[in-house]
Amino acid sequence: KGLYEIGTSFHVFNKSNQGITPTVYYQFLHDGESNQGSAFMPSFTGTAYYSEEEDFEKISFDDVKGENNEFKSKVINNGWIGIIQRYFVSSWILPSKQDRKFFSEEIDNSNIYRSGVLTPLEIMPKEDISINVNLYSGPQLKQDLEKAAPGMELTVDYGMLHIIASPLFSVLSGIQKFVNDWGVSIILLT
């Protein structure tokens, strides 16, 4: 309860007498629907990624639709990629300095989208390796996101009310830590 980071581990043994160069895929699928928010306060649903070089970026599913994919892929050696929607985020968090290629695309004009990361490996003959990657999948709780990976807290989107909402949420979180109940925290804040 209360833990949203899942450690994943893959074990690969190259039994051959030749080196191999497999690629590991980590991806999410989304149906492209975003029936969340209102016309006055819309919420973003789509791909998001973070890297030290480019900071935090959001990519709407419309931007990766069909042949006009404006994102396609991005090759870097740090950061994370995920899918965000109102109140929730899921992201793959790879170890730093590990080469990776982020991607986001529509699958066969189906309004189904995949976003993820490819990681090339080099495995020598008779070598056996372990690959450890974290998956964060849970609510956009700023304190948990800050612990998960650099830039994850940027997935919290208060929209145009950010200047008011951000400090208010910090106070609300402080109350929640004390009373351990979000409902009671909201009542006490208001």
Residue ranges and their predicted role:
Residues 187-190:
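Cytosol/matrix-facing ends of alpha-helical transmembrane segments
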Residues 136-185:
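Interfacial loop/helix-cap signal at membrane boundaries in integral membrane proteins
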Residues 1-155:
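Soluble non-transmembrane domains of integral membrane proteins
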